[in-house]
Every structure is written in C-alpha cells, then in structure tokens.
C-alpha cells in the first residue's frame, strides 16, 4: 500500500487469474484454454496482414472493426450495428458495468460465478446482490423474476459448468424489462443454447461472447457483445472515452478468419465435447462427484480427499488444475478438458494419488 493510492484502489480486491506455469511441457488444465490450435486460416490471415515487412503495423487499426463485425453479424444472422467488439470479453464486461449496470438498484448475480464480476462491481461502484445457487449448483430461475435490478450470469455458469435451457433464460429476460440482463456466453459453444436469437425481441438483453475458448484465440484477446443498437451505442460511448483502438490489426483479421472457418470450429467443439464425456467417465470411475457440464471443463469433488491437497500434489507432477478457496466450492476442482493424452495423464496421476 502507498500513500499515493486512491481510496478506490485501497479497497479493491483484484481478480486472480489462473497460474501460467513457466514450464516446458506442463499438463495445463487450469485456465480453460482450448487444447487445439486455431484454424489454419487464422495463421494464414495473420501472415497476409503482416506481409514481408510488417508495414501495416505502423498504421492504426480500424477503430470499429467493421469487417470483423460484419462477418460475425452474418454468422449470427443479426445486423452489424448489433455487434460490439472489445479487447477480450473481460473488457467488454468492464464497459458493460460502466455503461449499463450502474443504477439505483443492485445488480444480481449468482453467489458462485465468474469472480471478475464482484471485482468490476467494486471498481465501478456498482451495488450488487449475490443470489445463492441451489444445492446442485443450478441457477434457480424464480430468484430472478421480480424485476428488482440488473441481472448478470454466465451460461454455462463458471466455474460449475451448469447451463440453463434457453426457455429459462428467456423467462428471466422477459421478467426484467426495466433492467439490462447480461448473459455471459464464454462457454456456450460446448453444449448450451445461445440467447443471441432473442436480442431482436428483448431490448434489455445483452449477450457477451469470446474467441478465447471455442475458437482457440485466448492469446489474441477478442470479445463481443450482442444486443439492440441502443445498448451497443452505450458500449461504444464508453469505449471511445477510454480507448478508440482496442483491437489491433492482427487480432481483427485473426478473429475474422476464425469465424469464417465454421467447419474447423464445429469439428474442434465436437472433439472437446467428446473428450469431456470421456474425462467425466474416467473421473466417475475414480469416485469423483461431477457436476453436469456444458462447458469445456468439469467441476468435480472427491468425497474422501481434500481438493486443495489433490491440486498441490498434481502440481508437483506438473499437472495444473484450478482450486478455489471459496465458500461452498473449496472441495471442488475445476478441470479443463485437454487433449485425450493430457486427460489420460491427469487420470493416471489421480489414480496413483488416490490409491
């Protein structure tokens, strides 16, 4: 702490990202990255943009990412003016807190959810109300039907992996017409239904996406918001008061190429889903209790072994999983679905550790 810190900085509890081990060949199953590389079209698009000399890099990028927005809008069968692009979905969420969620009623989100939400709330002075999940970690829809303030939750939820059916999401959106409802769909492509199909019917709905998970671009930082033009305009007003050029040239062409290669995208998602099923069966055989997942990770606990101790012992073997020292989930591990070889290494290590 320093005497130069502002009051708000002194009060902040920053988000703690998953460990990025500086090892040659870790089995890295702790940050929900895609185990497969991006589409070959992405690599080719970056090479074309750079050319032989990289001369394009001396020019500022398109501040509104027009070509990318048009491609993504076509993919989702919406209009470009319904698409906002940011430097990763975390930045999109940050702008959303500033632009749409600070009102005289508290913002509601689950008590077990993406831990960046309370961080943003403290940073931007947004009142919040934590809504407890059910004992099985599902979102209780009836808890969000009273139009008592903004609503924000991931679908599928993180770190649990549970997903709400689209009909339940629509019930929540329809029941809160006086507030913005934000659905964070970072993991939607691995088994849930997207609410993007609802944005033309509900002017209070904002849907957030990322290229970090299903499109293997965590290293490029590209995120989106989808909603009616008035909501998107609010996000643009914040963006242009903060950074008019949030998305660099390489990120724009990479994301556009990733969206254009739908065959590769679909095949990669299918591989992850199949591996998730395989990993779930293997963990079940080791007596883990596993939360049903529609994401690229599983959330599991062992009834006879401490989760923190398991994570520490795995780390000694250069196998990394995520352990949260938080109420209700401190005996759970969040395990990213890796390649089959990575998952086999994890299961083999667990078999030895639990023997």
Curated annotation (Swiss-Prot):
Biological process per Gene Ontology, one example term: L-histidine biosynthetic process
Modified residues (N6-(pyridoxal phosphate)lysine): 213
One annotated GO molecular function: pyridoxal phosphate binding
Required cofactor(s): pyridoxal 5'-phosphate
Keyword Repressor part of the UniProt annotation: no
Top-rank taxon: Bacteria
Keyword Lipoprotein: no
Alphabetical UniProt keywords: Amino-acid biosynthesis, Aminotransferase, Histidine biosynthesis, Pyridoxal phosphate, Transferase
InterPro entries per UniProt: Aminotransferase_I/II_large (IPR004839), HisP_aminotrans (IPR005861), PyrdxlP-dep_Trfase (IPR015424), PyrdxlP-dep_Trfase_major (IPR015421), PyrdxlP-dep_Trfase_small (IPR015422)
Pfam families assigned to the protein according to its UniProt record, in alphabetical order: Aminotran_1_2
Protein family (similarity comment): Belongs to the class-II pyridoxal-phosphate-dependent aminotransferase family. Histidinol-phosphate aminotransferase subfamily.
PANTHER family reported in the protein's UniProt record: HISTIDINOL-PHOSPHATE AMINOTRANSFERASE, HISTIDINOL-PHOSPHATE AMINOTRANSFERASE-RELATED
Quaternary organization: Homodimer.
UniProt-recorded name of the protein: Histidinol-phosphate aminotransferase 2
Provenance organism: Burkholderia lata (strain ATCC 17760 / DSM 23089 / LMG 22485 / NCIMB 9086 / R18194 / 383)
Source species taxonomy: Bacteria, Pseudomonadati, Pseudomonadota, Betaproteobacteria, Burkholderiales
